[in-house]
């Protein structure tokens, strides 16, 4: 089976808690290689553009405000079934519903401050990766 790529963002709440290393360990233990990574402070324009699919939703402004509230860690993960595997280790969007041992169950505070973002499909993964990374920035691992 071919290896997939997926995008992951460690959100401002998890960066502020200094749990980046713990989250990276979970990726690697699940067989997901980190092939690109950067820490950045998103601008309002970047956050609005990235989450444009949610623009008409009532939570859009709060989501954008949260995503620009502090630095984020953005990474590309590579592995067998990377999209599904990453979503499994992230846990449910609402940390109260997330399975024990998932990233959100262990590190998220609320449905808004929920520690991580992960692509939900291969198509969205390709779009999201291209939003943050040039092809030459992805390492072959």
Swiss-Prot record:
Q: Which family does it belong to?
A: Belongs to the NDK family.
Q: What is the lineage of its organism?
A: Bacteria, Pseudomonadati, Pseudomonadota, Gammaproteobacteria, Legionellales
Keywords for this protein: ATP-binding, Cytoplasm, Kinase, Magnesium, Metal-binding, Nucleotide metabolism, Nucleotide-binding, Phosphoprotein, Transferase
The organism named in the record is Legionella pneumophila (strain Lens)
Please report the name of this protein according to its UniProt entry. Answer: Nucleoside diphosphate kinase
User: Does this UniProt record's set of keywords contain Transport?
Assistant: no
Q: Which gene encodes it?
A: ndk
| Subcellular localization | Cytoplasm
Disulfide bond positions: none
Binding residue positions for ATP:
11, 59, 87, 93, 104, 114
One Pfam family from the record? NDK
| Cofactor dependence | Mg(2+)
- The catalytic activity of this protein is classed by the Enzyme Commission as 2.7.4.6
């Amino acid at each position: 089976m071919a290896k997939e790529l997926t995008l992951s963002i460690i959100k401002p709440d998890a960066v502020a808690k200094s749990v980046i290393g713990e989250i990276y360990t979970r990726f690697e233990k699940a067989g997901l290689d980190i092939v690109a990574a950067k820490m950045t402070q998103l601008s309002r324009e970047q956050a609005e553009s990235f989450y444009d699919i949610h623009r008409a939703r009532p939570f859009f402004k709060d989501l954008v405000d949260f995503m620009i509230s502090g630095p984020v860690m953005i990474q590309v993960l590579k592995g067998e079934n990377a999209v599904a595997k990453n979503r499994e280790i992230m846990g449910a969007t609402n940390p109260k519903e997330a399975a024990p041992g998932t990233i959100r169950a262990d590190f998220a505070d609320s449905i808004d401050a929920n520690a991580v973002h992960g692509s939900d499909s291969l198509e969205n993964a390709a779009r999201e990766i291209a939003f943050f990374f040039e092809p030459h920035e992805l390492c072959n691992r």
